[in-house]
Amino acid sequence: MRAILCNAFKGIEALGFTEVDEPRPAANEVLVDVHAASVSYMDYLMSCGGYQLRPALPYVPGTDAAGIVLACGDRVTRFRPGDRVSCGNWFGAFAERMVARESSVALLPVNVDFTVGSTILHTYLTAWYALIERARLQAGETVLVTGAAGAVGVSRPQRRNRRSR
């Protein structure tokens, strides 16, 4: 299958298209036919070697994707082939197919486009974690979002509005 491969921690200059073996899902993983993958700052940092996690080289970058489940590991119970999903992994999304742990996969409603679905997990969950888990935001509190043009920043007001209803 075709994928983008990172051969050295030198940023986007070290990325290139190539053929790689299709991943196989472990017992707790799903194999996803990737219809869209998002690019995040974390992906960039990882390709430069500037993120706290450094995958073994070479590796297929990309943390978030959306697509259709092709196969499920033996212990997967929440998904089946044909399901539309949003999924995340530390790497592997910049390929035609990727694997993700069942716990890092969410069903994607039919009215949500794959391109939108590929941005949901890390950005929205980062915003959720910051506002709800860390800041312990309560209904009626005011939130100032700096850097609202980025993916996480855009998701914060949306999460805040939904939470206050």
PLM regions and their residue ranges:
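Residue-level recognition of beta-strand microenvironments
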Residues: 6, 23-25, 37, 72, ...
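N-terminal Rossmann NAD(P)H-binding glycine-rich loop of SDR-like oxidoreductase domains
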Residues: 149, 157
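NAD(P)H dinucleotide-binding glycine-rich loop of Rossmann-like/cofactor-binding domains
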Residues: 45, 84-147
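A glycine-/small-residue-rich N-terminal strand-loop-strand element
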Residues: 47, 66-90
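Residues forming the Rossmann-fold NAD(P)(H) cofactor-binding site
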Residues: 154
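N-terminal glycine-rich beta->alpha transition that marks the start or flank
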Residues: 11-12, 20-66
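Conserved S-adenosyl-L-methionine
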Residues: 161-165
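Short, flexible surface segments
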Residues: 27, 78-81, 139
